[in-house]
Amino acid sequence: MYVSYLLDKDVSMYPSSVRHSGGLNLAPQNFVSPPQYPDYGGYHVAAAAAAAANLDSAQSPGPSWSTAYGAPLREDWNGYPPGGAAAANAVAHGLNGGSPAAAMGYSSPADYHAHHHPHHHPHHPAAAPSCASGLLQTLNPGPPGPAATGAAEQLSPSGQRRNLCEWMRKPAQPSLGSQVKTRTKDKYRVVYTDHQRLELEKEFHYSRYITIRRKAELAATLGLSERQVKIWFQNRRAKERKINKKKLQQQQQQQQQQQLASPPPQPSQPQPGSLRSVPEPLSPVSSLQGSVPGSVPGVLGPAGGVLNPTVTQ
């Protein structure tokens, strides 16, 4: 042993006086040689216990303590349960080659399971490690270790891995298709029967805005509430406005398409041969003379004779 090797060395390495150089004036110091301890193999548990008892008695205060402070009470050693002695005996038994668990009366986990759990229950308390392993897998998304996999396989009665703590797992992100919701699914919706819709359409065709009295009568007749009848009329008017707006847009689009398809008409240019000369207007005297056949230039007299316009000389 290393300890015995140091003890068996020559004591000459610890001289009685310290050698010093001539330049330093140091007083000689005497060292006492260490006692010769027996070999380490000679120790026994009983000897170790006796040495510990002697050390405790040496450290315990005697009557030399002053009365002003009083002897300290070792209550901290008495605060432990009586099981401490059993633990010390178990340690001693383990040093001698035995098992400390056997000396203290503990049994193996298999014996404990055989004595205390003779029947197999489906809801076994040992499912807690599976829950803990599932929680650790949730917090740490890395690959599970072989120990956790083995524990999960042993806890499953059918041999398949099954996690008993599904409610502790983080829910997976749903797909985009499941996240899309329509407007009517999130709200309260009334499904009208064919007879109710027919009567409501008749009333809407008669009057787009229903009166309070007619609304109460129609609700009592169809088995609906007045609020439901009012909401149906509001939705029906909105639907009609939407339909009319769509029709107007379609008409405008058709007109635009027709204008783009047919080019605008171009003005026709006159041809040079088609132009004709316009006759000049005639005077009334010339027209009158031309209308009388064989007329002689002159003026008719009162007796019906013709007067010569020329003056005779």
From Swiss-Prot:
Keywords: Activator, Developmental protein, DNA-binding, Homeobox, Nucleus, Phosphoprotein, Transcription, Transcription regulation, Ubl conjugation. Its main location: nucleus. GO terms for biological process: animal organ morphogenesis; anterior/posterior axis specification; blood vessel development; endosome to lysosome transport; establishment or maintenance of epithelial cell apical/basal polarity; intestinal epithelial cell differentiation; labyrinthine layer development; positive regulation of cell differentiation. Residues 114-124 have a biased composition (Basic residues). Residues 249-261, 271-300 have a biased composition (Low complexity). SUPFAM superfamilies: Homeodomain-like (SSF46689). Residues 113-153, 242-313 are annotated as: Disordered. One of its GO terms (molecular function) is methyl-CpG binding. GO terms for cellular component: condensed nuclear chromosome; nucleoplasm; transcription repressor complex. Ubiquitinated, leading to its degradation by the proteasome. Disulfide bonds: none annotated. The keyword Ubl conjugation applies. Residues 227-241 are annotated as: Interaction with 5-mCpG DNA. The modification Phosphoserine is found at residues 60, 283. It is found in: Nucleus. The keyword Ribonucleoprotein does not apply. CDD domains: homeodomain. Pfam families: Caudal_act (PF04731), Homeodomain (PF00046). Expressed in the intestine. Residues 185-215 are annotated as: Interaction with DNA. Transcription factor which regulates the transcription of multiple genes expressed in the intestinal epithelium. Binds to the promoter of the intestinal sucrase-isomaltase SI and activates SI transcription. Binds to the DNA sequence 5'-ATAAAAACTTAT-3' in the promoter region of VDR and activates VDR transcription. Binds to and activates transcription of LPH. Activates transcription of CLDN2 and intestinal mucin MUC2. Binds to the 5'-AATTTTTTACAACACCT-3' DNA sequence in the promoter region of CA1 and activates CA1 transcription. Can bind DNA as a monomer or homodimer. Belongs to the Caudal homeobox family. This is Homeobox protein CDX-2. It comes from Mesocricetus auratus.
